[in-house]
Amino acid sequence: MPPAKKGPATSARKGQKTRRREKKNVPHGAAHIKSTFNNTIVTITDPQGNVIAWASSGHVGFKGSRKSTPFAAQLAAENAARKAQDHGVRKVDVFVKGPGSGRETAIRSLQAAGLEVGAISDVTPQPHNGVRPPNRRRV
């Protein structure tokens, strides 16, 4: 006997309510920009560290090596800033981490999106002679 066909996947959830995010009213926050060689992640938090909005180069729609470009970082920062402004964020302190190419571009696009940037600090972790670094590329 062939297996019974199941209905559309949405029918099981018809009666359930979807959980909407409540709008937080946070006028001052912190923007954490993690820029690696492969991607850029922008996270905007409240002063306690709870995430309000985030975006990354991959989340915006870039794939592969295009995620590491400054333009991808710019779009990710604009996207995160727009989401944060919906929650009432107007001023941010920026914390930049990592060696990637999207660091300065992301800060500039946060300002261009309408957020007032306060302090900018580099929180890239520096090893006190930790693990052995990867080999230099021979091209």
From Swiss-Prot:
One of its GO terms (biological process) is translation. GO terms for cellular component: ribonucleoprotein complex; ribosome. SUPFAM superfamilies: Translational machinery components. PROSITE patterns: RIBOSOMAL_S11 (PS00054). Residues 1-33 are annotated as: Disordered. The keyword Acetylation does not apply. InterPro entries: Ribosomal_uS11, Ribosomal_uS11_bac-type, Ribosomal_uS11_CS, Ribosomal_uS11_sf. One of its GO terms (molecular function) is structural constituent of ribosome. Residues 14-23 have a biased composition (Basic residues). Keywords: Ribonucleoprotein, Ribosomal protein, RNA-binding, rRNA-binding. Part of the 30S ribosomal subunit. Interacts with proteins S7 and S18. Binds to IF-3. Belongs to the universal ribosomal protein uS11 family. Located on the platform of the 30S subunit, it bridges several disparate RNA helices of the 16S rRNA. Forms part of the Shine-Dalgarno cleft in the 70S ribosome. This is Small ribosomal subunit protein uS11. It comes from Mycobacterium bovis (strain ATCC BAA-935 / AF2122/97).
